[in-house]
Design a protein with these regions (language model features):
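Structural signature for extended repeat/solenoid scaffolds and their inter-repeat hinge/linker regions
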Residues: 1-332
Length: 332
């Protein structure tokens, strides 16, 4: 896509996806607070929330190790023996840290009957090459199988091919230039593959959205609207359905407006009859790792739905589960 990849600075891994740097932070005090909260009769849930909902991925890593070294115990096992339900799910998601939780979710999504397609979308789509490689490596270390192998076994036909494009981790890096001629070419290809012909060339659309950088996708969406006075999002909704439609929309929104993408995913987990707690818990925890992004998501949510995200979450959840999610949204 323009200049050869060799000259382009790769996007660095997200916090928690690269080699763990030594941080000047001592987890001993928090480890002791956690042990005290769970030792003996009863559990001090407020302390669990206060300590765990406020840590970044590197601190969580240190804290998990400190707990293990100091008490010779496994923090996840202790938490599981003390609490239950979605509160437990949320705490464990935090303790694992973002990368191990991604791998845990992928394994869980593909090992039971039926595939949780939403989980595959949430974990794998719109990721940087560096994060995708980290996920694939850790998945292999954990399960002794390749992620490609398991995805192949769980998806069918064109959706499988779409996800194999995603897993190839050969997106343009974010520092790659956005070249107008290439954008125009992609726009025409997308038009010809969808509205411009009878029948849709699904894989061409998948290919473009799986290989371009966020900045390039943003430019493609902008140019498409200028040229054809229609949103690419509308076109995808009209031309696709099911899992592939959802996947392509998620890739498109990653480029056009990441905060709005996540605001819509959160609303999707709460809208309609019954809250999809599995999705809600993991989406809130995933978003909470990056505080700046979290604030943008809260702003986007308010802008779109005219109410605060935490207010909405409070209406859908209760008890310690509610308090944990609200704390993850930065309101402790």
């Amino acid at each position: 896509y323009g200049a050869p990849q060799a000259y382009v600075q790769p996007t660095p891994p997200s916090l928690g996806y690269g080699p763990a740097p030594n941080i000047q932070w001592d987890g001993t005090q928090d480890a002791e607070a956690l042990r005290k909260a769970m030792k003996g009769f009863g559990t001090d849930e407020k302390t669990l929330i206060r300590v765990l909902a406020t840590k970044d991925p590197l601190q969580v890593n240190v804290l998990r190790q400190s707990y293990n070294h100091r008490f010779g115990r496994d923090l996840i096992k202790d938490v599981k023996s003390e609490v239950s339900g979605w509160f437990e799910t949320g705490l464990c998601a935090i303790i694992r840290g973002p990368l191990n939780q991604d791998v845990y979710l992928l394994y869980e999504a593909m090992s039971g009957p039926g595939t949780k397609e939403n989980v595959l979308n949430d974990v794998l789509l719109g990721r940087s090459n560096a994060d995708m490689r980290a996920i694939k490596e850790t998945y292999h270390q954990t399960t002794h199988r390749t992620l490609e192998h398991d995805v192949k076994g769980d998806l069918s036909m064109k959706t499988e091919r779409h996800f194999l494009m995603v897993l190839a981790a050969n997106r343009a890096e974010e520092s790659a230039p956005v070249i107008p001629q290439q954008v125009d070419h992609d726009v025409m290809e997308l038009y010809k593959a969808t509205e411009g012909k009878m029948g849709t060339d699904e894989l061409l659309v998948c290919n473009i959205l799986s290989q371009r950088s966020d900045a390039q996708i943003r430019a493609i969406a902008h140019t498409y609207r200028q040229k054809f006075t229609r949103d690419l999002e509308t076109v995808i909704k009209k031309e696709f359905s099911g899992h592939m439609e959802q996947a392509l929309l998620q890739q498109l929104r990653t480029g056009t407006d990441k905060a709005m993408r996540d605001a819509l995913l959160l609303e999707d987990a709460m809208a309609g009859a019954g809250t999809k707690d599995h999705l809600l818990t993991n989406r809130v925890v995933r978003i909470h790792w990056d505080r700046n992004h979290l604030e943008q998501v809260k702003g986007a949510y308010h802008h779109r739905f005219k109410k605060s995200l935490t207010h909405r979450i409070k209406g859908e959840t209760s008890g310690d589960y509610e308090r944990l999610l609200v704390a993850c949204c930065g309101e402790i």
